[in-house]
From Swiss-Prot:
Family: Belongs to the OXA1/ALB3/YidC family. Type 1 subfamily.
Gene: yidC
Subunit-level organization: Interacts with the Sec translocase complex via SecD. Specifically interacts with transmembrane segments of nascent integral membrane proteins during membrane integration.
Natural source organism: Xanthomonas oryzae pv. oryzae (strain PXO99A)
Disulfide bonds: none
Protein name: Membrane protein insertase YidC
Length: 574
């Protein structure tokens, strides 16, 4: 198979794959529930007010060891009898990476201080928000059938003031809240923020100084009115998955759109350990319970809101005893290094390099190489250039074999022409004779395909690495490229790509090429250039450097085999 045909196959496969991905985005947009836009949305601080209904709540468990957790409620419908409470003052907690606004029960707003919304240094990204149209909150509450529990506004900060900040030289910020219920029952909730960490530790201590056992269970939920994103290659935010995901040691990892969950009746599963999360481009929130903690995992819709929830464990706290439960709330970016430090099994799956496992593995490998190159070069753009150089070195033996195969094919073109003339329209005999010739002369007709076929999964895996990696978000290369995950604003790299592809065509021998193929080849640089104008500039940088190196290697190999590049260029110009 000659190089021209291989290139055409590769080109059309790329076009088809990109069109398929774009069609998938448009289809997802068409399937998005339009009714959500017309439903009334409550105020942001009311998002956590709804507690489960009073129906079918299991009775208090027989008292186990004092203070020990009981079983998780076996149904998805639960209740709460909150003690009367007013509106709690909003308290602000600030670390070096997070600024949180909370009332002790819900985190109402969370700003990611090291991630501005735009490159020009605007306000930081608000992952959790009180925005009236699209509120997004994280709540941790208590529910019970008979015992008093804190309602909205029930918790109060133990220390005076409404602003607490991680001081210089301090690595941990600890802020306790308390709810004092009737009859001597209280719950002490402690928020712990650490320097450089996006996981917030939340510890609850149920202290029973009453004369009767206290029964209840904790629920933790993420509640979001999703934003309907405009779909298209010019909107990177629409490329990434936006929905719910969860993981359990028993069932593994699952990621689906809320619509798919609702079509199947939602999620209602008892799990020990694991985690549940809401994902969006570059960022996510997640509730991470203790490894030995049993919870009821619930995914459902509450009007226009997507709700991901953990219910449990249930507690029976004997008089004079204390029960404790802890969890982590992740509010932050999909940073590989920081996620790994949490040591939570499966949490790295929130970084979605591909829905296909083999492509995800390739993507993880590419990012590993990129991150190590970045540690030396201190620039993600130059790390991409370094990755291309490494790949070309690894693939050089295949490229050399490809050119040798192509050169051998050109050598036998006159004999192939004789066979075609001999057998005329009898294609079966012509193919048989051709294969016998290849076998006799030890020619591999597929020799030119292998390097390109190997590059295809690398190319598409790198596409998803660039789209998904928050490390590259707003990362500059040089000059006009100030964000490698966004398109080239001046289309310089796509133009260079067109020029390099055109030069490669002129340097590629095409003896006996079909006239129709020749016309198609003339348009391929323009087709690729148009596609590259709307994909991340980091991907175009990869393709430009790869194409430039390939052009130089091809020039050198032509001379190594005793051919003259100028002669090939003149032959292609005819």
């Amino acid at each position: 198979m000659n190089q021209t045909r291989v290139f055409l196959i590769f080109a059309w496969l790329m076009v088809a794959a990109l069109l398929w991905m774009e069609w998938g985005k448009e289809k997802a947009a068409a399937n998005a529930p339009g009714a959500a836009a017309t439903q009334s949305v409550p105020a942001a601080r009311d998002l956590d007010a709804a507690t489960p209904s009073a129906a079918n709540v299991p009775a208090a468990q027989a008292i186990p060891q004092a203070g020990a957790p009981g079983k998780v409620p076996a149904t998805s419908t639960t209740t709460a009898t909150p003690a009367a409470a007013g509106t709690a003052p909003v308290v602000t907690l600030t670390s070096d990476v997070l600024r949180l606004k909370l009332d002790g029960r819900s985190v109402l707003d969370a700003e990611l201080l090291q991630f501005p919304q735009t490159k020009d240094g605007t306000a930081p990204v608000s992952l959790l928000t009180e925005d009236a149209a699209h509120p997004y909150n994280a709540t941790s509450g208590w529910a019970s059938e008979h015992s008093p529990v804190p309602g909205v506004g029930g918790f109060r900060a133990e220390q005076p003031g409404t602003t607490f900040e991680l001081a210089k030289g301090q690595n941990t910020l600890v802020v306790p809240f308390v709810w004092n219920g009737p009859n001597g029952v209280s719950i002490r909730r402690t928020f712990t923020l650490e320097r450089g960490r996006y996981a917030i530790s939340i510890k609850d201590e149920v202290i029973n100084k009453s004369a009767a056992p206290w029964n209840g269970y904790v629920f933790r939920k993420l509640s979001r009115v999703p934003t309907i994103l405009s779909r298209g290659m010019t909107n990177p935010d629409s490329f990434s998955f936006n929905g719910a995901t969860w993981y359990s040691p028993q069932a593994g990892y699952e990621r689906r759109a809320f619509k798919d969950y609702m079509d199947d009746g939602g999620l209602n599963r008892q799990i020990t350990g694991g985690w549940i999360a809401l994902l969006q481009h570059h960022f996510f929130t997640a509730w991470i319970p203790q490894n030995d903690q049993a919870s009821l995992y619930v995914l459902n819709k509450d009007g226009p809101r997507d709700v991901a929830e953990l219910r449990g464990p249930a507690f029976t706290v004997a008089p004079g005893q204390t029960a404790t439960t802890e969890a982590r709330l992740w509010v932050g970016p999909k940073l590989v290094s920081l996620i790994a430090k949490e040591d939570v099994k499966g949490l790295d799956r929130v970084i979605d390099y591909s829905r296909f496992s083999i492509m995800a593995i390739i993507g993880q490998g590419l990012f590993w190489v990129l991150s190590h190159l970045h540690s030396f070069l201190h620039n993600w753009g130059w790390a991409i250039v370094g990755l291309v150089v490494l790949l070309r070195l690894v693939l050089y033996p295949l490229s050399s074999a490809q050119y040798k195969s192509s050169a051998k094919m050109r050598k036998f073109q006159p004999r192939l022409a004789q066979l075609k003339e001999r057998y005329g329209d009898d294609r079966v005999k012509y193919q048989q004779a051709t294969m016998e010739l290849f076998k006799k002369e030890k020619i591999n007709p597929m020799g030119g395909c292998l390097p390109l076929l190997i590059q295809m999964p690398i190319f598409f895996a790198l596409y998803w690495v660039l789209v998904e990696s928050v490390e590259l978000r707003q990362a500059p290369w040089l000059g006009w490229i100030q964000d490698l995950t966004a398109r080239d604003p001046h289309f310089i790299l796509p133009a260079l790509n067109i020029a390099i592809m055109w030069a490669t065509q002129k340097l590629t021998p095409t003896p006996g090429i079909d006239p129709m193929q020749a016309k198609m080849m003339q348009f391929m640089p323009l087709v690729f250039g148009a596609m590259m104008a709307f994909v991340p500039s980091g991907l175009v940088l990869y393709w430009v450097v790869n194409g430039g190196l390939n052009l130089l290697i091809q020039w050198w190999m032509i001379r190594q085999h005793g051919e003259k590049p100028s002669k090939i260029i003149r032959a292609n110009a005819k």
